[in-house]
From Swiss-Prot:
The gene is MFSD14B. The keyword Secreted does not apply. This is Hippocampus abundant transcript-like protein 1. Keywords: Membrane, Transmembrane, Transmembrane helix, Transport. PROSITE patterns: MFS, SUGAR_TRANSPORT_1. One of its GO terms (cellular component) is membrane. It comes from Bos taurus (Bovine).
């Protein structure tokens, strides 16, 4: 195989570090795959995330009711199992979908993940059993964040990504500011059927936006030269992806940090609203107001504060600060027995939301420009594993401590009385604080920035493959992504058509 001409190499180097405006020009010949409104930008990704989670936020109150009506016994436990199955399926599929988006582009997988994630929404009123079954199965495609973060990496320079990831995460929080309150109001005034209808319409709007307005962000030259490809299932195996993590100490530390920090967060997210309503005595309005408060503060934390912290403290110290706040708020929830304590801990929880965008920036810095989907897919896969284990773990701990959803009325005098006498009112949250403490200890050993871990090749795919015979040399090879190919071209190499490995 011949090395690519200097002109093409220079062009590809410019492509790897260009701003979205410059990228758009080089992709002008992309054809129909670039259909969309304007140039690819962070705003497209933010709108997709906002609409998807706004639709689900509308169902917050209704879902609590349907969950209790469908599983009147062991509600916490069943909630944990449902979310657990969904999370495990997400773990299995995230590396594959992230890697496929590196091959075929981001837009088709944005469309697929949003469609299948929102597919269960109308089933809530049609058949609750099918609704919860489809929620579990939809975990196969519930990896929108993986593709979104890869999309953002495509359209931003490296030094811009922490801010961009912060905006995307803040958009997620913004989608939950008003949607639960709107859903609670519509449910109380017009019934759950209207809430489900509105959520379905919002989900359809999101799908139409992706289909008609979102342009493709991945350059054509970063994709395979032939469609005659077959899947190498060994490389598509999520456990194989996790094995690659161990080849790079920096990525290994990051992944362990993500696992230990997100495991309690996933459990908390799956059960906290039930906990507020059952144990603390929050009504639907208070729950919606609580979500709005935390959402607004999270937006401020992930935009204004995150940017300032990244500049003043650095990436690693920002992650450590976020983990410290997360540990504090979980311990507060664990020992808290009064409503005001929940509100105060919610403020701390909002500040701790800076952790994930800061970690995503660390991952992006240690991944090659044409492997952002794979790298973010691995992190999303780990989060998916936590989404499976966390809810099940919290549900089991609630079950062991005999905390059950026996009533949905806000006035829970007997439960509150029992809560007052409990030494640890929220055992799962205190357990989560201990896990986050271990995550903090691991994160201490993460280097601020490691260029030696995964080489930052600015040349294009074809150019890097031209040097494939030299991989046996003593030079450093990117340890995480060197075996991340999931595609093997079935066509023989011909003059002018070299085998492409991603």
């Amino acid at each position: 195989m011949n090395a690519e001409p200097p002109e093409e190499k220079a062009a590809s180097e410019a492509e790897a570090g260009a701003m979205p405006e410059k990228r758009a020009g080089s992709r002008a010949a992309g054809g129909n795959s670039l259909q969309g409104f304007g140039r690819p930008s962070v705003y497209h990704a933010a709108i997709v995330i906002f609409l998807e989670f706004f639709a689900w936020g509308l169902l917050t109150t209704s879902m609590l009711t349907v969950l209790h009506e469908t599983f009147p016994q062991h509600t916490f436990l069943m909630n944990g199992l449902i979310q657990g199955v969904k999370g495990l399926l997400s773990f299995l599929s995230a590396p594959l979908i992230g890697a496929l988006s590196d091959v075929w582009g981001r837009k088709p997988f944005l469309l697929g993940t949003v469609f299948f994630t929102c597919f269960p929404i109308p089933l809530m009123r049609i058949s609750p059993w099918w609704y919860f079954a489809m929620i579990s199965i939809s975990g196969v495609f519930s990896v929108t964040f993986s593709v979104i973060f890869a999309y953002v990496a495509d359209v931003t320079q490296e030094h811009e990504r922490s801010t961009a990831y912060g905006w995307v995460s803040a958009t997620f929080a913004a989608s939950l500011v008003s949607s639960p309150a709107i859903g609670a109001y519509l449910s109380a005034s017009y019934g759950d059927s209207l809430v489900v209808l509105v959520a379905t319409v919002v989900a359809l709007l999101d799908i139409c936006f992706i289909l008609l307005a979102v342009p493709e962000s991945l350059p054509e030259k970063m994709r395979p030269l032939s469609w005659g490809a077959r899947i190498s299932w060994k490389q598509a195996d999520p456990f194989a992806s996790l094995k690659k993590v161990g080849k790079d100490s920096t990525i290994l530390l990051i992944c362990i940090t993500v696992f230990l920090s997100y495991l309690p967060e996933a459990g908390q997210y799956s059960s906290f609203f039930l906990y507020l309503r059952q144990v603390i005595g929050f009504g639907s309005i208070k729950i919606a107001a609580f979500i709005a408060m935390v959402g607004i503060l999270s937006i401020v934390a992930q935009t204004v504060f995150l940017t300032s912290l990244m500049r003043s403290l650095g990436n690693k110290n920002t992650v450590l600060l976020g983990l410290g706040f997360q540990m504090f708020q979980l311990a507060w929830y664990g020992f808290g027995s009064q409503a005001w304590m929940m509100w105060a801990a919610g403020i701390v929880a909002a500040v701790s939301s800076i952790t994930f965008p800061a970690v995503s920036t660390l991952v992006s810095q240690n991944a090659d420009s044409n492997q952002q989907g794979v790298a973010q897919g691995i992190i999303t896969g780990i989060r998916g594993l936590c989404n499976g284990l966390g809810p099940a773990l919290y549900g089991f701990i609630f079950y062991m401590f005999h905390v059950e959803l026996t009533e949905l009325e806000p006035e829970l005098i007997s439960n509150n009385a029992a809560l007052q006498g409990a030494v640890i009112p929220g055992p799962p949250f205190l357990f989560g604080a201990c896990i986050v403490f271990m995550s903090f200890l691991v994160a201490v050993f993460i280097p601020e920035y490691s260029k030696g871990g995964i080489q930052k090749h600015s040349n294009s795919i074809s150019g890097s493959l031209a040097n494939t015979p030299e991989r046996g040399s003593d030079e450093d090879i990117e340890p995480l992504l060197q075996d991340s190919s999931i595609w093997e071209l079935s066509s023989l190499e011909e003059p002018g058509h070299q085998c492409t490995e991603l």
